[in-house]
Amino acid sequence: FMNRKKNMRGGDMIANGIISYIDARYGDPDLSLALLADQFDISQPYLSSLFKQTHGINLSTYIENIRIEKAKDFLKTTDLTINKISEMVGYGSTNSFCRAFKRVTGISTSEYRKS
C-alpha cells in the first residue's frame, strides 16, 4: 500500500510537470503526446493514462483547450491577424485552428473577436 501511494505521488509530480511544460510551450506546433513522453522519459500509453487519471481529461484535449484559451485572449486584446494568432498558439494551419476554435467555443474566430 505504501509503495502504491508513493508511486501515485510520483505520478502526480510527473503530471504537474507536464502541465507546466505545456503551459510554457503551447505555441510549439510539435507539442504532442510523443514529444512529452520523450521529454519526460516515459511511455506514451503511461503518460496518456496518467494524465487522464490525474486531470480527468485527455492530454490532446487539454493542449487544445490551452491553445484556444490563449487564442481567445489574443483575439480580445490584440489586432493580430487570425493567421498570426494560429501560429502563436501552435497550429500548423489557420484552417485547423479555425475548425478547432469553432469546435471548442461554438463560434468562429471573427464572431468571437466582434463579441
Outline where the language-model segments fall.
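Basic, amphipathic alpha-helical hairpins
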Residues: F1-K6, I19-L31, F51-H55, K72-T81, ...
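Append "Primarily bacterial transcriptional regulators
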Residues: L35-I42, L47, F51, I85-G92, ...
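The cytosolic transmitter module of two-component sensor histidine kinases
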Residues: G11-A15, I82
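Conserved phosphate/pyrophosphate-binding and hydrolysis machinery centered on Walker-type P-loop NTPases
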Residues: M8-D12, D30-L33, F40, T61
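…primarily DNA-binding HTH/wHTH and HhH modules…
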Residues: R99-S115
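Generic hydrophobic, amphipathic alpha-helix propensity
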Residues: I14-I18, I22, I63-I68
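Residues within well-formed alpha-helices
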Residues: G17, K70, I85-M88, V104, ...
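Terminal helix-turn-helix DNA-binding modules in bacterial transcription factors
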Residues: Q53-G92, K114-S115
